[in-house]
Amino acid sequence: AGFVGANTVDFNDYSQIIATRNFVEGGTNVYQGSSHGFSVLSTMAADKNGVFVGTAPFAKYVLVKTEKELSETPEEMYNWIAGAEYADSIGADIINSSLGYSEFDDPNDNYTVDDLDGRTSIISLGAVAAARTGMLVVTSAGNAGGGAWNKLTMPADADSVLTVGSVNQFGIVSGFSSRGYTTDGRIKPNVCARGEGAYVYRPDGTITPANGTSFSSPIIAGAAACLWESSPSATAQDVIKALEVSSSHYYTKNERIGYGIPNMKFARFYLSSNPGNEISVYPNPFPDHLIFFLPDDNTTDISLELRDMYGRIVASEVITGRRYQFRWVPGEYIAAGTYFLKITRGSKIQVTQVFKI
């Protein structure tokens, strides 16, 4: 709704804002109205040594205002689409969207929870279109949790969009964080990050805690920018998959936390070591267990054989069930040294050298 403070507060030692656009009042002045956008921006772009560092302080930023401060009308959703088109036209890689819609000043314009299918609201359709250009669209899940609506707010229901819910400092889902699923049964939110007690810059230059998925979303967007930079040949959908697969609740996903809180170290390994149909193995060297990342939703049994330098099988197992990721403990009595891991999945055989420490 505005970026008041972003042009006056010394929150970044570098000049990272390269363009601005105002689709509400017109022109390029976005430093008016509300400071919400500045607080959102600070979670990514802040870089004051010894004070506060955001998740992507060296990224370049374009500030786009699409939200009216004092009203809630469908016009704002069209503003959002215009903003997304503008972002695409200037070559933006990632959109962070810290807003959501469900009800409006005129009740005749309201949506219902049955409309949360990603194909009904104009803003969700716009978000899908933006994602199909190759941009990574990251959006807040909404702050309707526990209320009469309780569910996601649009465009958080959009397919191919990374929807982010909120947790507190202990990893517990925030009461206000909007719940999934979508009406067609898709997992939303995709992931979560801290949006309860998240530290942000204020327009007076102070740093204080704030609540909202408006802040968990950019925290993930900034982290995703760094992740993508580490594997520039990946696609936006590859980045989303890496974040999901690496998350804390991948095997117990639900409508509150989605796939969970991403482990960026695992996500980076998955993204950088998972070309084509190859199965990734981590860590290497390994202490007592190995983690396997699959490039697709596997439904085929996987045969594992760990052989020593003499070709002797020291551990083996057949893994069954549908999964993208699994953990294997070869055995507690395996000596430190070099081994060859044979992975058989259907007609495909992969041999990887691993080191036990």
Kindly label every feature range from the protein language model:
Residues 1-21, 26-76, 90-93, 104-106, ...:
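Subtilisin-like serine protease catalytic core
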Residues 41-44, 64-68, 151, 195-257:
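Hydrolase catalytic cores
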Residues 47, 66-157, 170, 183-186, ...:
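Substrate-binding/access-modulating region of protease and related hydrolase catalytic domains
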Residues 92-96, 229-284, 314:
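C-terminal subdomain of the subtilisin-like protease fold in secreted/lumenal serine endopeptidases
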Residues 195, 296-301:
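Short proline/glycine-enriched turn/loop motifs at strand-loop junctions of beta-rich domains
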Residues 273-296, 307-312, 355-357:
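Surface-exposed, proline-anchored Ser/Thr-rich loop/turn motifs
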Residues 325-331:
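Exposed aromatic-hydrophobic patches
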Residues 332-357:
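C-terminal tail/sorting-segment detector
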